[in-house]
Amino acid sequence: MPINSISPQYADQVSSTVTDPVTQTQIKVATFNLFNYLAPPDAFYDFDRIYSAEQWQKKENWIASYLQTHQPDIIGFQEVFSIEALETLVKKQGYDYFAVVDKPTVIDDFIHRDPVVALASKFPIKEVAAVEVDKDLVMQLGLSADFEFSRQVVRATVELPHLGLCDCYVVHFKSKRAAWQGDVDKLTSLEGNVLSQFKAQVAGGWASSIQRGSEATLLLMNMMERRAKKGNAMLLMGDFNNPLKDGILAHLITPSMLFNNDQAQQKLVKFYTLRDAWDLYEANQKVVSEDTLTRAPTHYFGQSSSVLDYILLSSEFDAAEQSSYFEVSDYINTDKHLINPIFEFDGESTDHAVVSINLTLRE
C-alpha cells in the first residue's frame, strides 16, 4: 500500500455493519496495540522471531473476535508490521476505510523493525497526512535539528455523523527503554561495568523521556495550529508509553492559561485543549451514581502495572461544554487476556489492554 493512503473498499456502498449516519446516535472509538503484528514467514526484530502458521491464525482470530464483539467505529492501531494483512482483516469486519502514512524498516528482506501506526474506520476518511515536525519549534525547544517522531503520527480526517469532520490522530510515543546501553568491557572490573550500565540506564532513560515528551509537545502544537485553521473536532488515541499525568506528558491535557483571570480568554483556550476520555466518563457517571470508579491498568510488567493507552478528546465531546455534540457514556478496558487468559484463545493476543469508549449524542 502506498504511504499517505486512504483505502475506501466500497466507495459507493454502505457497509452492512454501519448504521445510517442520520440515525446513528453512538460512536465507538478504540485504541489497540497489536503487539508485533507481522505475518509469517517474516521476522520481527530478530531472525528467529517468526510466528508459525497456527500462531498467526490464532492472532488473526483474536483480533477479529475483538472487532466482532465490541464493534468500534474507529480504531487506532499500534505495532503494525504487516500493513496489507491488517487492511484485509479489518475490511472483512466492515471497515471500509484504512489509513497509514509510513512503513516498517526491513533488513535482509525479512527482518522487520520500526512498526507503524494505522487507523481503520467505518466512517469516510476525507484526508490522511503524516504530522510534520515544526523545525523552528524544534530549535526553540533546544532539540537536535534532525529531531523526528520515533514513529510517524497518522492524522486522518473522518466524517462523523451529526458532528462532521474530526481530525483523528494515532500515536505510539517513544518507549521508556533507555536510548542507549552501557558497554561491557572484559578488561574492566565488575564494579566498573555495573556502574557503566547503570549510568547508561539513568541517562538513556532520561533521553527517552525527553524524546517522548518532546513528541507530545510538537504534536500538540501541530494539533492546535490545525484546529485554528480548520476548526475540526480532535481525537487523539494511542499507546503513550507513559502515564498521562506524571509530568512527561501532562501538558497534553493542560486545561487553561496560568495566571489569567479573563474568563473570555479562558473560554477561547478551552477550544484548543484536550480531555482524557476517562475523566469525562468519570464526571458523567458522578451525575448518575455515587459509586467510586477505579481506572484499570492497560499494561502489566512484572509486579507493576500502569495506564499507558489513552483516548483524548476536544470540547465537542465534553458534556460540561454547552456547545458539545457528544458525551462519553462508556469506557471499556478489555483486559481479560492479561489478568485471566485462556491460552487456547488468548495465547497470541496482545500485551496491552484494548481501550474503547462510547460517545453518545447529547439530547
What is the predicted role of each segment?
Residues 202-230:
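A long, amphipathic alpha-helix that forms part
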Residues 32, 78, 171, 238-239:
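Active-site flanking residues adjacent to catalytic metal/cofactor-binding acidic residues
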Residues 2-18, 130, 146-149, 220-235, ...:
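Metal-dependent phosphoester-hydrolase catalytic domains
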